């Protein structure tokens, strides 16, 4: 299974909509930057028909060093999670 990259998306959109690669790159970069900024400022991002990027706070917990087996503290942190929407889930399930 192949991986799609940001460059693949830019090239596809540029060809499909007959836009310059530079203009398309700017649109894609700005779109992703808005998502990054929203998450950075503590806002969840909801993309209708696609899914939600949500922030979750994880509390500190004891972890384990896999090499030595020693218990090490894992500090509290904030993580980004993605929850696919119903439409995306349904389409992905059809492709199995």
From Swiss-Prot:
Q: Name one Pfam family in it.
A: Bac_DNA_binding
CDD domains the UniProt entry points to? IHF_A
Write the record's keywords in alphabetical order, separated by commas.
DNA recombination, DNA-binding, Transcription, Transcription regulation, Translation regulation
Q: Does the keyword DNA-binding apply?
A: yes
An individual GO BP term: regulation of translation
List the Gene3D superfamilies hit by this protein, alphabetically. IHF-like DNA-binding proteins (4.10.520.10)
The UniProt GO MF terms for this protein read: DNA binding; structural constituent of chromatin
**What does the entry list under GO cellular component?**
cytosol
Key word Transcription present in the record? yes
- Record-stated family: Belongs to the bacterial histone-like protein family.
**What does it do?**
This protein is one of the two subunits of integration host factor, a specific DNA-binding protein that functions in genetic recombination as well as in transcriptional and translational control.
Give the quaternary structure. Answer: Heterodimer of an alpha and a beta chain.
The name of this protein is: Integration host factor subunit alpha
Originating gene? ihfA
């Amino acid at each position: 299974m192949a991986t799609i990259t940001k460059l693949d998306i830019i090239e596809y959109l540029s060809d499909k909509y007959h836009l310059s690669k530079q203009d398309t790159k700017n649109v894609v970069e700005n779109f992703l930057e808005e998502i990054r900024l929203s998450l950075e400022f503590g806002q969840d991002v909801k993309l209708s028909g696609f899914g939600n990027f949500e922030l979750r706070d994880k509390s500190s917990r004891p972890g384990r060093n896999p090499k030595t087996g020693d218990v090490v503290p894992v500090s509290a942190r904030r993580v980004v999670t993605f929850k696919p929407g119903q439409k995306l889930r349904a389409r992905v399930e059809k492709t199995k």
